[in-house]
From Swiss-Prot:
Protein name as it appears in the record: Uncharacterized protein ycf45
Xref: InterPro entries: AAA+_ATPase (IPR003593), P-loop_NTPase (IPR027417), Spore_III_AA_AAA+_ATPase (IPR045735)
Keyword match Plastid: yes
PANTHER family per UniProt: KINASE-RELATED, P-LOOP CONTAINING NUCLEOSIDE TRIPHOSPHATE HYDROLASES SUPERFAMILY PROTEIN
Family: Belongs to the ycf45 family.
A molecular function GO annotation: ATP hydrolysis activity
Organism: Cyanidium caldarium (Red alga)
One GO CC annotation: chloroplast
Keyword Chloroplast recorded: yes
Binding site for ATP: G130, R131, P132, G133, I134, G135, K136, T137
Source domain of life: Eukaryota
Length: 335
């Protein structure tokens, strides 16, 4: 597995003393974020720790210089660096002035595909879940590359903040031959998802960060039209996703059902229980918890039913070693 994150592009958009410190750092290639806050020292973030990069504090003047070079932030306070996968987000005070910047390091993972190759080659809609910053978007880029370059599928990426395909007129090479539809407003992402189907005849739609009621409904509509969907959502695990009132619709939704006395006795449960309301628009789910380890649920509906009924929920733990060897073990988990 090869990991690429070109830090050279940060030179124009961070203070020079921060870049010099970063360039000398022994673990610079494992960096996930750089944080610049007014009146504080520059901070570097890794998966397992955070540390100060400089002794010198960031001033308002430093931030203004960075902002001038970065350019315009969109309505969700994000910007990108041209022809890269990096993302910059800003923090504003109550007067609308920028007082902090977060630089997210965009990565290209080449070779992570084999760990989920069977799911990629199948015709299954797949949902990737995990906490923010765990690597869902990097997985999605590699899935897009394999589907469009190797399997030769017609793939369209609906890119809300150019986070999947990077900033610029042309999608980043890491996404393969997939076409990209940019979203002008974060409130119109669901409309672009439907537009992609109606106008461009894709076989597969890819979308990052499904998070609103409208986007969930659009995902359901896409699945009902027979289009394969690859998406991601923020959640620590499938159990918490099923409890989320907005995102639970992606896996069929949950409703309260009252049983008769006889049914309750036969099921050995309470009279009022929770059941899956409908069909899931995703067939499989991939939980990303570690860098090279994923938990795979090959049947979302069976897994959700098991969670709601308190039964043992079977999943697969898949890991990739540094030498490329893949191990798969069954995980018997009682939710």
């Amino acid at each position: 597995m090869l990991i690429f994150n070109d830090l050279r592009h940060f030179l124009p958009v961070v203070p020079r003393f921060v870049y010099k410190s970063l360039k000398k750092h022994p673990r610079k290639f494992g960096l996930t974020e750089i944080v610049l806050d007014n009146g504080r020292r520059a901070e570097g973030r890794w998966r397992e720790k955070t540390e100060n990069l400089t002794h010198k504090k960031i001033t308002k003047k430093h931030l203004l210089r960075c902002i001038k070079k970065i350019g315009i932030f969109n309505e969700d306070n994000r910007a990108g660096i041209y022809q890269t996968l990096h993302r910059i987000s800003c923090i504003k005070n109550r007067y609308g002035n920028i007082v902090g910047l977060t630089y997210r390091i965009g990565r290209e993972f080449i070779g992570i595909g084999p760990i989920i190759r069977d799911l990629i080659e199948s015709n299954q809609s797949t949902l990737l879940i995990g906490r923010p910053g765990i690597g869902k978007t990097s997985f999605i880029r590699e899935i897009s590359r394999i589907l469009s370059n190797e399997i030769m599928k017609r793939v369209i990426i609906v890119d809300s903040a150019n986070e999947i395909s990077g900033e610029g007129c042309c999608p980043h090479i890491s996404t393969g031959k997939a076409r990209r539809m940019e979203v002008q407003s974060i409130n119109s992402q669901h409309e672009v998802m439907i537009e992609a189907i109606e106008n461009h005849t894709p076989e597969i739609i890819i979308i990052d960060e499904i998070g609103t009621e409208y986007e969930s409904q659009a995902a359901i509509s896409i699945s009902q039209r027979g289009i394969r969907l690859i998406g991601s959502a923020h959640s620590s695990d499938l159990f918490n996703l099923a409890k989320n009132p907005t995102l639970c619709k992606l896996v069929g939704g949950i409703e309260s059902v009252t049983l008769s006395d006889t049914q309750a006795i036969l099921r050995k449960t309470k009279k009022t229980i929770l059941e899956r309301k409908g069909c899931s628009c995703f067939n499989a789910t991939i939980e990303i918890n570690k860098k090279r380890t994923v938990k795979v649920y090959t049947s979302v509906e069976q897994s959700i039913d098991a969670i709601l009924e308190g039964r043992v929920n079977n999943s697969q733990i898949r890991s990739m070693k540094l030498n490329g060897e893949i191990t798969i073990s069954l995980n018997y988990q009682d939710e």
